[in-house]
């Protein structure tokens, strides 16, 4: 079956910094991401992203959630983040028996309240999926504002960069 036509990507006005909640999935929803080697490759890829800030990420077995924003260039699309990130992970891992699903899901976070709700959603995802009993026990979470594995207590602590 052919894929439905895709809408062209949109960019927002330049007057305000933007933060997105982005979900990337593994093709066929294969459970390959919750692995120490893959997690290291993901962290390396995020550190190599030059045009995007990653405020937090939760890596699930078959998908990953990110809270991201462009550093300075307002003309960037979420597709630029997804493409660049996937390429960097692939380069870091070398050959892999799996591939990323095409595209991504993204949601523009319009307020601190929205940012907080998505942060909590991502943090609690391993609990909802029955992988751990407490979110703090999930090893495949990090942010680049606080200590790895520790979430900011409020969106303003996440310092929208």
What role is predicted for each listed range?
Residues 1-161:
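Short catalytic/metal-binding and nucleic-acid-binding patches
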